[in-house]
Amino acid sequence: NVQLDPFFQEQQQYYPQQQAFFLLQQQQN
């Protein structure tokens, strides 16, 4: 699993779709 910031790990509970989008952005960087 990709290591995320603690703040984002908390957010993913409420925005799982945003997490998927965020992971795609991170992979492109």
Curated annotation (Swiss-Prot):
Please state what the protein is called.
Answer: Prolamin alpha-1
Q: Which organism is it from?
A: Dactylis glomerata
What does UniProt list as this organism's lineage? Eukaryota, Viridiplantae, Streptophyta, Embryophyta, Tracheophyta
